[in-house]
Amino acid sequence: MKNKKALFIPLFIIILFIAFFNKIINFIINIKWFKEVNYLTIYFTKMRAIIILMIPIFIIFFISIWMYYKSLMINKNKSIVDIGLNKNDYGKKLFFIFNFIASIFLAYIFSSSYWYRILQFNNSVDFNVKDPIFFKDVSFYVFKLPLFESLYKVIISLLLFLVITTFIAYFILEAKYKIQSKKDINLKNINHGIKSFAGKQLAIVSGLIILFISFGHLIKIWNLVYSSNGVSFGASYTDVHATLLFYKIIVVITLISSIVTLLSIVKGKFKPVSICIGITIFLIVSQNIASFLVQNFIVKSNEKTLEQPYIKNNIDLTRKAFALDDIEIRDFDIKNDLQKQDITDNKASIDNIRINSFKPTLEFYNQVQIIRYYYTFNDIDIDRYNINGKYNQVFLAAREIDTDALNPNTWQNRHLIYTHGFGAVMNKVNSVTSEGQPDFVIKDIPPYNKTNIKLTNPRIYFGEKTNDYVIVNTKINEFDYPKEDSNKTNKYNGHAGIKMSFINRLLFSINKKDINFLLSKDIKKDSKIIINRNIVERAKKIAPFLTYDSDPYMVIYNGKIYWIIDAYTTTNRYPYSEPYDSINYIRNSAKVVIDSVDGDINFYITDKKDPIVNNYDKIFKGLFKEEKDAPKEIREHFRYPKDLFSIQSKVLGKYHVKDPGVFYNGEDLWEVSKDQKHVEGETNTNDAPYIIMKLPDQNKEEMVLLNYFNVMKKDNMIALFGARMDGEQYGKKILYKLPSDKTVYSPYLFKQKINQDTNISKELSLWNREGSQVQYGDTIILPIKNSLLYIEPLYLRASGKNSIPEMKRVILSYNDKLVLSPSIQEGIKEIFNSKDNKINDKNEKDSTKTIDDSKLKKAQEYYNKAIEAQKNGDWTKYGENINELGNILNSIK
């Protein structure tokens, strides 16, 4: 017997080890990885919190369950107990083991579920904003109330669990007693039996349940700030004058009832317990009836007047929660009286007008610049750079490896050879080639660079498409980039990765379920495995409590590619704030910067005023750095994020209104303007563009994120909403309100104006014939002084599977003028009837030259061949013909 007991503990440990084997392996690998990226303390924050919490929680659970068990065992009804668990010490030992395991399990579940809320509670940071009903700081609702709710649910659940298990225990023991004593089971005596077995215990539990019902209604009182019963979000007239009153009464009555219940137990009287429970149920039902009567017989007929103060609460706090309370609002009186000097003063804005559009440019990148089939451009980013002394807006993209496209897709190819992407592509947004294609300033492999931007190490080990692990410094050279008939190879010289010792090879073989880690002869002791290479997943692994932007963007700095991810702090617990997309508070409080070669990742706080990020900073010490610690050249590329701007625009459509009466009437609702991508296509919401522009009353150009607003369900534009992002202006928002008594063309109305112009529509119809299709680019509406300039690039796509759109014309509109032009500059000249002497002089000189007709015919021939090659996707032939065409054109200059 002793030998069996001696074997029990090691056997139990072995069973636990087998059951949690995979978790143990993951745990060891996580420790190694977090140590590699220098965030091991962040990983241990959670573990340390869980362990510290588990100890007192375990003691509370263990003692409570044991005391409850003992109280049942000293019952007067010995008939059950003697035959039950109290017959010998074996029952006590069995219950002790059960209680020990159950208490550990419950303590772990509780601690792992609520450690974060407890740490948030302990590290609460004030918002310095009070709710208008209970005058509590918002931090109470965001950091403290969630923990109270969790504790309430857990304790109520445990108390109900005790009641249920008590009944189950009674029935089991009663049945066992009846069977062993060969007596019939009499259901009529159940009530008496339960009272004898656990009457006092159940009465105590009932008293505690009533006590926590009181606490639950106190929580309901605080939760009225999230009520959706009124015309606006938050506590309404009915909530404050009826529901709140009843909740307060219920809190007091249930508190008294719990005391009465406990005193009744001492005196051995159970009738008061039933009365207290009945009163509680009556009050809860009465509250619902009273609220219904107040809403329908008092509020409904006087709603606008009675609800106004509560609507104002909703407006004020929603605007604060979505950072709309600091918008600079200006009237924009459209006069359309620009002079030639105004055009000259805004030349930099006009020169940076974007005529390249996202989708066709990405298509072109993936046709012309992937170089090999296994490369891909995941998306295109837009940013601003000082190129050769000029402030330019550019498109740029990183050339990543698409490992799923590898052929053959072997283990060595996927994990040892094709380890990284190579290079970047950049073009200015304001210019195209003579064929209407992006005009590259950085392109090809190795990079051909016409800029002053240094790119000396363009390798991409960490990116948006790097979803698999790689092993570097093996006996096999890594593929670097293709060069003519051979390939350039590379040895990784970064510091990312975990050394592949035999133990680590074994760990990863188990973790990845791949024997190749052990069998491969190419892996050396100095080899390193690089995991978690996807930049967003890498950030989430370290800081899962942040919300990340859907569009990370690349920056070229210090000769390398870096990634920037906008990180948000969000909550749905901000009082009175209307929820949008399941949140009712958001701040872009951090920027995440990741090195594409070394994988170094840094979290920079960019909004020190945000209490949530300050709460995180107190909990996860060492995670965040100050914004000033980021390199200046990186900070210059911080953008106002489009995801944040999108949700702010959605909220602003309703909450630009500050007057409760107007808000109640719903008479001034806005929506983001619609747009049309094809001549005869469907409409969709306009995508907010990043624009280089000089804001009215400003002295220099800057990058601004701009959205256009219409009146709800109308196409008349009513406002321009912009977010600034250059230097000290970062984060400042401005709203230009347009005249409501004039028709101001929205992007969609602008398209209708184009379609109704007889000359332009005729030209579009000719292009949009069988074999080709006209596509609209990204609509830009540029404010210049007190006027609006409309720009619409036109793309022509030839038929054919691999054809790509080419930018052929630009439509410009100003006031009542509408022109179709080969370029922005020519369109501006046509609209404003201005003349450029240099251009005219050059044209005059060129017109005196005699051009050989045979050269023109040859040029036409090469052009036709190039177009045919493009349709067929034969980019080699296409390039050859374009080069020949270029030679002819150069010869006739």
Swiss-Prot record:
Name of the protein: UPF0182 protein CLJ_B0017
Domain of life assignment: Bacteria
Alphabetized UniProt keyword annotations: Cell membrane, Membrane, Transmembrane, Transmembrane helix
Subcellular location(s) of the protein: Cell membrane
Bilayer disposition of the protein: Multi-pass membrane protein
Predominant location: membrane
Family indicated by similarity: Belongs to the UPF0182 family.
Transmembrane segments annotated in the record for this chain: 9-29, 49-69, 94-114, 154-174, 202-222, 246-266, 273-293
The species this protein was found in: Clostridium botulinum (strain 657 / Type Ba4)
Any GO CC annotation of this UniProt entry: extracellular region
